[in-house]
Each structure stands twice: as structure tokens, then as C-alpha cells.
């Protein structure tokens, strides 16, 4: 029986339209194989939305996203809009989208593909076999805490302050997401905090420990954030799933991303309690190569795989896409960001064609 899904496409800026076009072709091919009907609707966000409407997130875009089963985003931003006030820049469209959809959990996988192990700056024996997931809380912590501000004190010196605050319900909901993901992966969850000096982190640790009693099959551990950062570089294979707050997750997820050696390969997902999630590559809009058929579409394609797995509960279709990505890398196809001597250099469209061929091949099944 055919299963139908409404997907909002947000190509955005820079290389976004190019990598989105490849990904839509892949999803259509997957739909034929797995009897899935995707109803795609494209909408504006970021710089392209500013140019067309004057706003980085038009109300029509948010309404379309809310009416969908999942949102696939490509890239936002570019030099063209850097002179705008911060509150009007393209990136605020993404913040508004997350808030408008109630997204609070950011999933950032970092898996070392065997074909690209030498792209990492770490030694092969350290990095080989790494497959971890960082679950970051998105809507609380020091980025959103009140009060905050900047003022001149009695001596005329400028002072600035922010507030790091979490409620127990905010901690519990991100904790349950992380425990559920860990249960489906390696059944190991490391909670990262700074409970030795921060009261907010002590509450975080207490709530995670309490939640752990509901997940007896998941091994829970705790690390202070400074030690966690060190351990990610020293021996990343010790981690399976990491859960942490907004600030710490912002830092640790970027460390984890660079373990792989290429940010052009990394997908991400942002999820809420209900409604559609947003699935997007970690990389930016790369305006310097936009329109030149040089972009690497693999992170966008893998974001579509995450959409299938975490947004639409279609894990077999997701695995098929991931197998196709592995197959084209095995065959030596590389875009410019991954190219090395002896490989076959292809552009964005060429990589898409190779992926489509792999999907039709029984080798990737």
C-alpha cells in the first residue's frame, strides 16, 4: 500500500538549489522502490526570501512547513546579505522556523565512512570506526535565558551578562529523545554538563539520572564538558550517543563534525514533540561555488535519509540511500572537496547521477 508524505522543500541560498535538486531526484527514485509518494512543495527562506518578500521567513513559508510531514532545508545565507542588521539577516529565518515549529532537539551524527577515513586530521587508529550522535537541546540555556543585557556601571565600564537557565521539563524532554535514540543505537548514552560548578548543570545531571531509571537497557554515563571535549579528540570511539545543553552542544557537535574530515558529508535533524522536523546539511551555502556544479550534494542526500528515518519512520528507505552513498564512494566518485589522486572527479549533477545508478544496482541493497 502506497504511503504518502507532504514534504516542504526549502532550497534557500547559494548551492542550496543545486543540492536540493539532486536530493529530490534521489527521493523520487526511493519512492518508486519503496512505494512511497512524496508530495513536494517548495517555499522561500533566508536570502532568497529577503530578495522576494523582504523577510527571511515569510508567513506563507511557515504555514506551508506546519502543514507538511517533514521539512527539507538546503542552505541559508551569503555575503550578499551580510550588511543587513543582525535581526534581518537570512540566518534569522532558520531561528524563526525552529521556534515556529517548536523544535527543541538537534541531532548531529558523526560517522567515519571507511572510504574517507584518511580525510580526518586524526590518526587512522583513533578515528576508524567512529559512529556517534550528538543530541543538543535547542531552545533553552544561555542563548535564550533571561535576564540578559549590556550596560555601563558606576565607573562607566561596559558590562554584559547572560543567564543560563533550564527547567526540569525542558531537560526531561531532551533526555527522553536522547535515551530513545540511544536505545535504537548502541544502548549507551553520555550526558555532558558542568555540574561541578554550575547549579543549572547539577539539575541537568539529577534529571538525566532520574530518567535513566526508565531506560534500564541503556547505559548512562556523565562527563564534564571540558573532559568530554578532550575525550572526543583523544578517543572518540568510546562514544555512542551524547546528550547535552544548548551551549555545550553547539561546541561539541562542531568538534564531532570535524572528526570526519569533511563537513560536506554531515547531515542534521531538528525535532519537536510533534509536527514536522527540519532536516538539513551542516555545511553552509558556499556562495563562492554556487551555480558552478561544484557542490557536494551528499550531506543533503544524507539529510533526506535522516528525514526518512527520524521524521517519517521509513528506516529501510533511509538505509537504502545510505548504502547508495557508500557505494558511490567505494566506486571512487568524489566532488572537489573530497577529491584525491586516483579518484574520479565529478560535479554535483555527476554525483547525483552516480547515486541514481547505485540505487538501481543490487550491490547497494
Curated annotation (Swiss-Prot):
Pathway: Amino-acid biosynthesis; L-leucine biosynthesis; L-leucine from 3-methyl-2-oxobutanoate: step 3/4. GO terms for biological process: L-leucine biosynthetic process. Its cofactor is Mg(2+); Mn(2+). Mg(2+) binds at residues 226, 250, 254. Its EC number is 1.1.1.85. It comes from the Bacteria. Keywords: Amino-acid biosynthesis, Branched-chain amino acid biosynthesis, Cytoplasm, Leucine biosynthesis, Magnesium, Manganese, Metal-binding, NAD, Oxidoreductase. SMART domains: Iso_dh. One of its GO terms (molecular function) is magnesium ion binding. It is found in: Cytoplasm. Substrate binds at residues 98, 108, 136, 226. The record marks 143, 194 as: Important for catalysis. NAD(+) binds at residues 78-91, 284-296. One of its GO terms (cellular component) is cytosol. Catalyzes the oxidation of 3-carboxy-2-hydroxy-4-methylpentanoate (3-isopropylmalate) to 3-carboxy-4-methyl-2-oxopentanoate. The product decarboxylates to 4-methyl-2 oxopentanoate. Belongs to the isocitrate and isopropylmalate dehydrogenases family. LeuB type 1 subfamily. This is 3-isopropylmalate dehydrogenase. It comes from Synechococcus elongatus (strain ATCC 33912 / PCC 7942 / FACHB-805).
Amino acid at each position: 500500500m502506497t504511503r504518502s508524505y507532504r514534504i516542504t522543500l526549502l532550497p534557500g541560498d547559494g548551492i542550496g538549489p543545486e543540492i536540493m535538486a539532486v536530493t529530490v531526484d534521489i527521493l523520487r527514485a526511493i519512492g518508486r522502490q519503496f512505494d512511497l509518494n512524496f508530495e513536494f512543495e517548495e517555499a522561500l527562506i533566508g536570502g532568497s526570501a529577503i530578495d522576494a518578500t523582504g523577510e527571511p521567513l515569510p508567513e506563507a513559508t511557515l504555514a506551508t512547513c506546519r502543514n507538511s510531514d517533514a521539512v527539507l532545508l538546503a542552505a541559508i545565507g551569503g555575503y550578499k546579505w551580510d550588511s543587513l542588521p543582525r535581526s534581518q539577516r537570512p540566518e534569522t529565518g532558520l531561528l524563526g522556523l525552529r521556534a515556529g515549529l517548536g523544535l527543541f532537539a538537534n541531532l548531529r551524527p558523526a560517522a567515519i565512512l571507511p572510504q574517507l577515513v584518511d580525510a580526518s586530521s586524526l590518526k587512522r587508529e583513533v578515528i576508524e570506526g567512529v559512529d556517534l550522535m550528538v543530541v543538543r537541546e535547542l531552545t533553552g540555556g544561555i542563548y535564550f535565558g533571561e535576564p540578559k543585557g549590556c550596560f555601563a556601571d558606576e565607573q562607566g565600564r561596559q558590562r554584559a551578562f547572560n543567564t543560563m537557565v533550564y527547567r526540569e521539563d525542558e531537560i526531561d524532554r531532551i533526555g527522553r529523545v536522547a535515551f530513545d535514540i540511544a536505545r535504537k543505537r548502541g544502548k549507551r548514552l553520555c550526558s555532558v554538563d558542568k555540574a561541578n560548578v554550575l547549579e543549572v548543570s547539577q539539575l541537568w545531571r539529577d534529571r538525566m539520572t532520574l530518567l535513566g531509571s526508565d531506560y534500564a537497557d541503556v547505559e548512562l554515563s556523565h562527563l564534564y564538558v571540558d573532559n568530554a571535549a578532550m575525550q572526543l579528540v583523544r578517543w572518540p570511539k568510546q562514544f555512542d550517543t551524547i546528550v547535552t545543553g544548548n551551549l555545550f552542544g553547539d561546541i561539541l557537535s562542531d568538534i564531532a563534525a570535524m572528526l570526519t574530515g569533511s563537513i560536506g558529508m554531515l547531515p542534521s535533524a531538528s525535532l519537536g514533540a510533534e509536527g514536522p522536523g527540519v532536516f538539513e546539511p551542516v555545511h553552509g551555502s558556499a556562495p563562492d561555488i554556487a551555480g558552478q556544479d561544484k557542490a557536494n550534494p551528499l550531506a543533503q542526500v544524507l539529510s533526506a535519509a535522516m528525514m526518512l528515518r527520524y521524521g517519517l519512520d521509513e528506516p529501510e528507505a533511509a538505509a537504502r540511500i545510505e548504502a547508495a552513498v557508500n557505494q558511490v564512494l567505494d566506486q571512487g566518485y568524489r566532488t572537489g572537496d573530497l577529491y584525491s589522486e586516483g579518484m574520479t572527479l565529478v560535479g554535483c549533477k555527476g554525483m547525483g547521477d552516480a547515486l541514481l545508478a547505485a540505487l538501481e544496482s543490487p550491490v547497494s541493497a
